[in-house]
Amino acid sequence: MDYEFLRDVTGQVIVRFSMGHEVIGHWINEELKGDFNLLDRIEAGAAEVKGSERQWQLEGHEYTLLMDGEEVMIRANLLEFEGEEMEEGMNYYDEESLSFCGVEDFLQVLKAYRSFMLKY
């Protein structure tokens, strides 16, 4: 899982992730947006579920973050297509709408993001 932090011409931090994990970057850019209070809530949520079978969820405007003791899932809220029939041989492209990673890797990304926000 490769990623980079950039600032655009307006000073906004943009996060980009490698293929297969793009949705994590979209989630950070759309939902987190430099909100340190939200970062604190997510880190506290990770501490709550660590070593347990419980889950912690944060539903945002565009994406939902779901975390258990081992794994983080981020998915687009519009990912579910209920009642729609697809033509035979067709399927939805959801590579940029759903991503999984380990909790420790995710927390490392958030730590690096916080550091980048404070430093640059």
Curated annotation (Swiss-Prot):
InterPro entries: UPF0231. Pfam families: UPF0231. Belongs to the UPF0231 family. This is UPF0231 protein Spro_4007. It comes from Serratia proteamaculans (strain 568).
